[in-house]
Swiss-Prot record:
The keyword Amino-acid biosynthesis does not apply. It comes from Escherichia coli O139:H28 (strain E24377A / ETEC). It comes from the Bacteria. Heterodimer composed of CysD, the smaller subunit, and CysN. Its EC number is 2.7.7.4. This is Sulfate adenylyltransferase subunit 2. Pfam families: PAPS_reduct. It is an enzyme of class 2 (transferase). With CysN forms the ATP sulfurylase (ATPS) that catalyzes the adenylation of sulfate producing adenosine 5'-phosphosulfate (APS) and diphosphate, the first enzymatic step in sulfur assimilation pathway. APS synthesis involves the formation of a high-energy phosphoric-sulfuric acid anhydride bond driven by GTP hydrolysis by CysN coupled to ATP hydrolysis by CysD. The gene is cysD.
């Protein structure tokens, strides 16, 4: 393929499809982590392209915390059914039994037990040796230095000082029993690339990404959308309807909305052209402490 003849987006698309096919051919039991967000939607679209007209040769895995937005759950089930994907859903049973709650236990403990430990449980349960993730290098500084093939030891831990060289498009997937690789086909994409590709390919996304009047309250410098009744209002807090959308999606108590009037994809793309902040500014889990994302990844977070 002549790279000079491809547009920027088509080059990214070709690279991602190549990575996805390499993993499917090289590993015995891969899985695609499906978090329901825009990056997962693009990654799933690329995977379907990679194996068209056949079906995906691996399942989707959603590590459920029980606190995602209702629209995310509806979108997840609708998407899996529409594309005929095998969807595995895992929720940490110990965390459920303990009643882990982001309001009571805080973002760090909630994320560690329901997401990190939940993910490791699922990977061990099904014996996956490679797991696709939708992380991108432009999102956050620890992800910026992570390889496309990210080696994890038998405890699913990442050591940033023990990464393998990746020369051109040659990836080292050699692992011993119990070890695994996290694979990031979207590593070289930016948030702007993601939105332009979604528009170009007409990819379906969760409506929460588009601006609408939604019930929110201000807490800890964040606009929290109230998605159900599992919240106790603090003194002085008032729920108001405001025009907001989300740049990133996660557990609703830990994901801040942004004020916006962008109700269409072209309007989102235009908004991104002048944005000077990271999309993860609304993620409470990234504020736990300095270097919190790298610490989470060292412990097994995706």
């Amino acid at each position: 393929m002549d790279q000079k003849r491809l547009t920027h987006l088509r080059q990214l698309e070709a690279e991602s499809i190549h990575i996805i096919r390499e993993v499917a051919a090289e590993f015995s039991n891969p899985v695609m982590l499906y978090s329901i967000g825009k990056d997962s939607s693009v990654m799933l679209h690329l995977a379907r392209k990679a194996f068209y007209p056949g079906t995906l040769p691996f399942p989707l895995l959603h590590v459920d915390t029980g606190w995602k937005f209702r629209e995310m759950y509806e979108f997840r089930d609708r998407t899996a059914k529409a594309y005929g994907c095998e969807l595995l859903v895992h929720k940490n049973p110990e965390g459920v039994a303990m009643g882990i709650n982001p309001f009571v236990h805080g973002s760090a403990k909630h994320t560690d037990i329901m997401k990190t430990e939940g993910l490791k449980q699922a990977l061990n349960k099904y014996g996956f040796d490679a797991a696709f993730g939708g992380a991108r290098r432009d999102e956050e500084k620890s992800r910026a230095k992570e390889r496309i093939y990210s080696f994890r030891d038998r405890f699913h831990r990442w050591d940033p000082k023990n990464q393998r060289p990746e020369l051109w498009h040659n990836y080292n997937g050699q692992i011993n029993k119990g070890e695994s690789i996290r694979v990031f086909p979207l590593s070289n994409w930016t948030e702007q690339d993601i939105w332009q590709y979604i528009w170009l390919e007409n990819i379906d996304i969760v409506p929460l990404y588009l601006a609408a009047e939604r019930p929110v309250l201000e807490r800890d410098g964040m606009l929290m959308m109230i998605d159900d009744n599992r919240i106790d209002l603090q003194p002085g807090e008032v729920i108001k309807k405001r025009m907001v959308r989300f740049r990133t999606l996660g557990c609703w108590p830990l994901t801040g909305a942004v004020e916006s009037n962008a109700q269409t994809l072209p309007e989102i793309i235009e908004e991104m052209l002048v944005s000077t902040t990271s999309e993860r500014q609304g993620r409470v889990i990234d504020r736990d402490q300095a270097g919190s994302m790298e610490l989470k990844k060292r412990q097994g977070y995706f």
